[in-house]
Curated annotation (Swiss-Prot):
Localization of this protein: Mitochondrion matrix, Kinetoplast
Region entry Disordered, spans: 177-204
Biological-process GO terms, alphabetical: mitochondrial DNA replication; proteolysis involved in protein catabolic process
Protein name: ATP-dependent protease ATPase subunit HslU2
Subunit details: A double ring-shaped homohexamer of HslV is capped on each side by a ring-shaped HslU homohexamer. The assembly of the HslU/HslV complex (HslVU) is dependent on binding of ATP.
Compositionally biased intervals (Low complexity): 177-191
Native source organism of the sequence: Trypanosoma brucei brucei (strain 927/4 GUTat10.1)
Pfam families assigned: AAA_2, AAA_5
Gene Ontology molecular function: ATP binding; ATP hydrolysis activity; peptidase activity
Length: 496
């Protein structure tokens, strides 16, 4: 498959600040991740973690691949006009809506945030502003950008850290040597001569020799190094100030920016000092400008925003209980989803044109057609997620790469307990989960956690009684552990 020009991906980062070779290398690697990921392959990877919901996987796989296709287009004007097709996932809770989106973002290490629509209010009402969604996305992108830049400069930072530790080690040796010479004058001639010989041999150690032996011969030697310590306490602007303008003015005046760290001299052993020196070296090699430039590129070009419970801010048009604030949230989401420039607290701007928005909701009491028409038009891809059946629950227990039963086996292994689930136990777990969901509130696959924990309660608490033994969980054990749940009429009192 043809590799695309990675320069287009990092163009926005270079527009914000001169992109360093590190930023360019990372954006190139980020862009090339999608080269060999066809929609079919993306769906296949998602199959390893999520059972069923083929239509949902298909939709996000196409959206992810469309990002790659857009970057192949040479005509810049045409490429600018091709926008992501935002997605609306409709289905009950616990069927995999969030997990599909999260795994899709994780597949390409894209910045990802999950928010609930009910947490936001219309501008002018008490509550969070929808533009804070982009602030959260940018914060997530900065974390990823910082980590990637540090990985890119890891070898260089390690070399610099060794130099810092070596200089501290050498200074410490020199100081102890000058102190020792004055005290040894009154001591035994033979012993002082031997000490002088050892001291002299260490004083003559070169940096290359130190690099070879710092893990063995010199690891317990003491060194003195300077490290940067961040001041304790809240260094952010007053939380009650929500105005972007006030924050920007504060930053310009030096009131709202993050406080710089204070240099502190510490004495450590060589093996303890090296991690501190490495972090110190990384802080020199990776500056805030590089992090911000890369974070902006990642957020704008690869960001994914998952808005859950979108149906909770939708009311029937003729309803007497229509909430004007909830309708206003839909209105406020329009420019965000359509594409606009959002001003962040630090005064910089993030374009939402190419951010992928995935909205989801159960839509039990309202219909998707009850959303305001403009919002419907900005969510052109709609996917119906089906409720989980007993067979789906059974597959969820066994098929995902890191399924619940595998997790329980690994946890018990740490207690030297060999745990085994028989096939009829898996069937019984699926049956109980399905029945409880049918008789109580249906929370989908999340119910499995409650049922499995009820079964494992005895072995988790009394683990010392089963140490060194093999524990076999069959259908009878499951029935005994969950019998009180199944025999109760009002299951809601006992289940989440």
């Amino acid at each position: 498959m043809i590799r695309f020009s990675w320069v287009r991906l990092c163009s926005s980062a270079m527009a914000a600040a001169a992109a360093s070779p590190d930023v360019q290398a990372i954006t190139r690697a980020q862009a090339m991740q999608l080269d060999d990921l066809s929609p079919r392959k993306i769906a296949s990877i998602l199959d390893s973690y999520i059972v069923g919901q083929a239509e949902g996987k298909r939709a996000v796989a196409i959206s992810l691949r469309n990002r790659w296709r857009r970057r192949q287009i040479e005509d810049e004007g045409l490429r600018r006009d091709i926008l992501p097709k935002n997605i609306l996932l409709v289905g009950p809770t616990g069927v995999g809506k969030t997990e599909i989106s999260r795994r899709m973002a994780k597949l390409t290490e894209a910045p990802f945030v999950k928010v609930e629509a009910t947490k936001y209010t219309e501008v002018g009402f008490k509550g969070k502003d929808v533009e804070s969604i982009i602030e959260d996305l940018y914060s997530n992108a900065k974390t990823k950008a910082k980590r990637r830049l540090e990985i890119e400069r890891e070898k260089e930072a390690h070399e610099l850290a060794l130099e810092i530790v070596f200089n501290g080690w050498h200074s410490c040796r020199s100081a102890s040597g000058s102190f020792g010479s004055s005290t040894r004058n009154s001591g035994s001639g033979d012993s002082s001569a031997e000490e002088d010989k050892n001291s002299s041999s260490r004083d003559n150690v070169t940096f290359e020799e130190f690099k070879e032996k710092y893990k063995t011969q010199f690891k317990d030697d003491m060194v003195v190094i300077d490290v940067t310590q961040q001041p304790k306490g809240n260094t952010k602007p007053n939380a009650s100030i929500n105005s972007v303008e006030m924050l920007s003015v504060g930053i310009l005046l030096g009131l709202g920016s993050e406080s710089r760290g204070v240099k502190t001299r510490v004495t450590k052993r060589v093996e303890e000092a090296l991690p501190l020196a490495t972090q110190e070296a990384l802080s020199r090699l990776v500056d805030e400008t590089q992090i911000s430039a890369l974070a902006r590129t990642l957020a704008e070009q690869d960001g994914v925003v998952f808005i859950d419970e979108i149906d909770k801010v939708v009311t029937e048009p003729a309803s007497a209980n229509a909430d004007v604030s909830s309708t206003g949230v839909q209105q406020d989401l329009l420019p965000l989803i359509e594409g606009s420039n959002v001003t962040l607290k630090d005064g910089s701007q993030i374009s939402t044109d190419n951010i992928l928005f995935i909205c989801s909701g159960a839509f039990h009491t309202v219909k998707t057609s009850d959303m305001i028409a403009e919002l419907q038009g900005r969510l052109p891809v709609r996917v119906e997620m089906h409720a989980l059946k007993e067979e789906d629950i059974r597959r969820i227990l066994c098929e995902p790469k890191f399924n619940l039963l595998l997790q329980q086996k690994a946890l018990m292994k740490t207690e030297n307990i060999d745990l085994e689930f028989t096939p009829d136990a898996v069937d019984e777990l699926a049956r109980v989960t399905t029945k409880v969901n049918a008789n109580a509130q249906n929370i989908g696959a999340r119910r499995l956690h409650t049922v499995v924990e009820r079964v494992m309660d005895e072995y988790s608490f009394n683990c010392q009684d089963y140490e060194g033994k093999k524990v076999v969980i069959d259908a009878e054990v499951v029935r005994k552990a969950t019998g009180s749940l199944m025999n109760n009429i009002d299951l809601a009192k006992y289940i989440l």
